[in-house]
């Protein structure tokens, strides 16, 4: 598996930890400012595919129509996150490939690079079901709803 992975040119993998952390605990007390948000958008836009665990990052990748691979190797407590209602809906779209081994990961990477269009219909479903509109006016709509209560 590693030998096959080595055939992919060096320098095409990036591990990003955006934002400012206010705690040593993973996933707790952190914030992303505008610069980090733009960097994340740029990183996804210029990526051939996105590999992450159960995360709204899958929705971000679907918005930019990038193949999505979710890691589920450990079978421990993190595995149960894939069973939660909100994420199960994302998996059911067919727009995300969930892999449970190193071999499945390599196969999914190679297949996604060779045929990025394969899960496109599922990514469209993710956008339709999880995002609704991609017109840049969500803040305006939220503000209008809030103003309607005044």
Q: Whereabouts are the PLM-identified features?
A:
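An acidic, carboxylate-rich microenvironment
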Residues: 42, 103-107, 141
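Donor nucleotide-activated moiety binding/catalytic core segment of transferases
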Residues: 4-59, 124
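Generic hydrophobic alpha-helical scaffold/packing signal
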Residues: 41-44, 96, 143
């Amino acid at each position: 598996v590693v030998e096959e992975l080595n055939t992919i040119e060096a320098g095409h993998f990036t591990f990003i930890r955006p934002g400012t952390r206010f705690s040593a605990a993973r996933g707790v007390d952190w914030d992303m400012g505008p610069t980090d948000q733009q960097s994340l958008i740029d990183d996804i836009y210029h990526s051939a595919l996105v590999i992450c665990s159960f995360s709204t990052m899958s929705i971000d990748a679907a918005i930019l129509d990038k193949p999505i691979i979710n890691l589920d190797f450990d079978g421990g407590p993190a595995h149960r996150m894939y069973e939660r209602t909100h994420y199960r809906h994302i998996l059911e779209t067919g727009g995300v490939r969930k892999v449970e081994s190193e071999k499945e990961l390599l196969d999914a990477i190679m297949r996604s690079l060779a045929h990025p269009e394969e899960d496109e219909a599922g990514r469209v479903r993710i956008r339709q079901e999880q995002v609704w509109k991609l017109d840049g006016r969500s803040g305006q709509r939220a503000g209008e709803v809030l103003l309607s209560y005044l």
